[in-house]
Amino acid sequence: MKVNKELARKLSKKIVFSVPKDKESLSAVSDFLGLLGVLYKKEPKFRDFVLSPFVSNEQKKLFIKSLIQKGNIPKEIEFFVDELIDLNLLRIVGEIKRLFDYESEKILSIYKGKLIFAKEPVKELVDEIIQRVEKVLNRKIEPEISVNEALIGGFELRLSGLVLDTSVRSVLQNLSNKVKSL
């Protein structure tokens, strides 16, 4: 499946410009796009319904717009549903969501990322790491904290445009690569 990245970029920017710029609206739209992507990829009945030539485009639009009304999603996104159905673009909703999230992070000056530790961290350590990285980047960070014992020690911070790796595993890999090159 080839994704038309330029079309996805245009649609995501169109959504960003039409939706209110508050955190709740942007996160609601992001969740809605994620829901559409999961439904299309993992739910065969939904995919069959959307791709069926026997179901009119109006019925498809009505169904997806009813999902918008049931959720707390801004009404400004309804034009997007029309374009999705008319151009049969539900297959690229995942790419549109990724680009939308990137654009909304820029608007809100927030980085969403993953903070991975080798063992369960102390709250003070997490706060200190986040505070120092926020100071360097001049942006707020909303990390999702997880544990991966394969790191041996240290942590990894993965943001959309940055990976900060202070784990023992990466140090050992770098040392191994240097020894191999000798």
Curated annotation (Swiss-Prot):
User: Which UniProt keywords are listed?
Assistant: ATP synthesis, Cell inner membrane, Cell membrane, CF(1), Hydrogen ion transport, Ion transport, Membrane, Transport
Topology within the bilayer: Peripheral membrane protein
Q: Does the keyword Ion transport apply?
A: yes
- GO MF annotations for this entry? proton-transporting ATP synthase activity, rotational mechanism
Q: Which residues form a coiled coil?
A: none
| Keyword ATP-binding carried by entry | no
Q: Output the InterPro entries linked to this UniProt entry.
A: ATP_synth_OSCP/delta_N_sf, ATPase_OSCP/dsu
Q: Where mainly located?
A: membrane
Localization (cell): Cell inner membrane
**Database matches in Pfam families:** OSCP (PF00213)
What SUPFAM superfamilies does its record include? Answer: N-terminal domain of the delta subunit of the F1F0-ATP synthase
Family matches, as Gene3D superfamilies: N-terminal domain of the delta subunit of the F1F0-ATP synthase
GO CC, alphabetical: plasma membrane; proton-transporting ATP synthase complex
The family this protein is said to belong to: Belongs to the ATPase delta chain family.
Quaternary structure annotation from Swiss-Prot or TrEMBL: F-type ATPases have 2 components, F(1) - the catalytic core - and F(0) - the membrane proton channel. F(1) has five subunits: alpha(3), beta(3), gamma(1), delta(1), epsilon(1). F(0) has three main subunits: a(1), b(2) and c(10-14). The alpha and beta chains form an alternating ring which encloses part of the gamma chain. F(1) is attached to F(0) by a central stalk formed by the gamma and epsilon chains, while a peripheral stalk is formed by the delta and b chains.
Function of this protein?
F(1)F(0) ATP synthase produces ATP from ADP in the presence of a proton or sodium gradient. F-type ATPases consist of two structural domains, F(1) containing the extramembraneous catalytic core and F(0) containing the membrane proton channel, linked together by a central stalk and a peripheral stalk. During catalysis, ATP synthesis in the catalytic domain of F(1) is coupled via a rotary mechanism of the central stalk subunits to proton translocation. This protein is part of the stalk that links CF(0) to CF(1). It either transmits conformational changes from CF(0) to CF(1) or is implicated in proton conduction.
Q: What is this protein called?
A: ATP synthase subunit delta
UniProt organism field: Hydrogenobaculum sp. (strain Y04AAS1)
Q: Which gene encodes it?
A: atpH
